[in-house]
Design a protein with these regions (language model features):
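A short, structured surface patch at a secondary-structure boundary
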Residues: 97-157, 161-167, 264-267, 295
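Single-pass membrane-anchoring alpha-helices
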Residues: 1-30
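Bacterial Sec-exported substrate-binding components of ABC uptake systems
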Residues: 24-25, 31-36, 40-107, 177, ...
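His/Asp/Glu-enriched short active-site or ligand-binding loop at hydrolase and phosphoryl-transfer sites
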Residues: 122, 252-275, 295
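Short helix-initiation/N-cap motifs at beta->coil->alpha
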Residues: 84-86, 140-152, 271-280
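Short helices/loops that flank or line small-molecule/ion binding pockets
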Residues: 149-159, 177-178, 278-287
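A ligand-binding cleft/hinge motif common to bilobed small-molecule-binding domains
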Residues: 168-177, 290-310
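Extracytoplasmic substrate-binding proteins
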Residues: 78-80, 87-90, 161, 170-245, ...
Length: 358
């Protein structure tokens, strides 16, 4: 009996030893698994840290680009500008005192938000404000005539940027030789005017406003062009620049381009010069459907009255006269290389195809 009990105890001990050994091996396996998991976790953490490091580098690069862009948008980054005559001007800071030697440039400056920096204008700059009143109040200075203005009044204003045109090219050259920054703005097409707006916007630190303004003008132009595309005919248009010695507008002029975009046919589109002198007989022969005359600065006209036009010899046979299709337009919106050319386009389109514009 004692032997049996001894055997049983021995068997139990062996079983306990086996079970204990198995548990120890299993525990060691678990420890090994934990060590492997920890290694994997450390590798993952290393990958995450590497990724975070890359992201931090990218953020640093983005911040650097943003800072550079902010500096450029603020006008503090040096910019190089090329005007319409190929002259190069380098600006290291935004201009604070601007002189405009052309009414078109004055209009653009105020349109892009740089009007508060304009300290001098010519005596024909009349938009967007009556600058005569400003000058009398001491809030603006007159630098004299548009054609070849005197340099002395400009120097007195000590401008850091002057916007000129070919009408003031001699004064512009003198100012450049004296060390002043001068940009000559002389666009020849409507797209050229839009480029001038962007140029002036960049020069003054207002290129965001200039870009938005150009987009607005393009949208208005596209609306007109799309509308007149539905016209069933192309009316012949005569525009008289000056009289009584008749001068009209030919190729290479804003007037010719505007008439075409507005859905009309300029009867002197094929003239040999931009502003041809024409005979009354030629106008009668070309028989325009629409006649447009300008009123000039301060409302003056060179052609007299409608009765004067109607009484021109032979003009009573012209279709436009017979149909009373005679119109007057503000010369400043159709001949100035400024932002109101889009106003002229809309006006001419409505004159030529009134049925399309309700």
């Amino acid at each position: 009996m004692e032997k049996i009990i001894t055997y049983i105890v021995a068997i139990i001990a062996i079983i306990a030893l086996v079970v204990g050994s198995y548990g120890f091996v299993a525990f060691q396996g678990q420890i090994s698994d934990l060590e492997t998991s920890n290694t994997d976790l450390e590798a993952s953490m290393s990958d995450i840290q590497s990724t975070l490091s890359d992201i931090q580098v990218q953020i640093g690069e983005y911040q650097e680009n943003i800072t550079q862009l902010e500096e450029e948008l603020s006008g503090y980054k040096e910019i190089t500008l090329v005007d319409d005559l190929g002259n190069v001007v380098v600006l290291t800071e935004p201009p604070e005192r601007i002189v405009s030697l052309a009414p078109s440039n004055t209009e653009i400056l105020f349109a892009v938000g740089a009007g508060d920096k304009v300290v001098g204008v010519t005596n024909v700059c009349d938009y967007p404000y009556n600058f005569t009143a400003w000058i009398e109040a001491g809030n603006m200075s007159s630098i004299g005539p548009y054609w070849q203005p005197a340099v002395e009044p400009i120097i007195t204003l000590d401008p850091d940027l002057v916007f000129a045109s070919t009408a003031s090219e001699e004064a512009a050259e003198t100012l450049k030789n004296l060390g002043y920054n001068v940009l000559i703005v002389e666009p020849k097409t409507i797209n050229g005017v839009l480029e001038s707006i962007l140029l002036i916007g960049r020069a003054t630190g207002n290129h965001v406003e200039a870009g938005e303004f150009v987009n607005e003008i393009r949208d208005r132009m596209d609306a007109v062009i799309n509308t007149v595309a539905g016209a069933t005919s192309t009316p012949k248009v005569y525009y008289e620049v000056w009289g009584p010695d008749i001068q009209s507008a030919g190729p290479g002029t804003f007037i010719d381009e505007l008439i075409t975009l507005a859905g009309g046919e300029n009867i002197f589109h094929d003239a040999g010069t931009s502003f041809p002198m024409v005979s009354s007989e030629t106008v009668i022969m070309k028989n325009p459907d629409v006649i447009i005359f300008p009123h000039m600065y301060m409302g003056t006209v060179s052609w007299g009255t409608y009765a004067d036009i109607e009484s021109r010899p032979g003009w009573d046979s012209i279709t436009a006269i017979q149909n009373d299709n005679f119109h007057i337009i503000d010369a400043s919106i159709i001949s100035r290389s400024g932002p109101r050319l889009v106003d002229a386009l809309e006006t001419i389109a409505e004159i030529i195809n009134p049925e399309l514009f309700g």
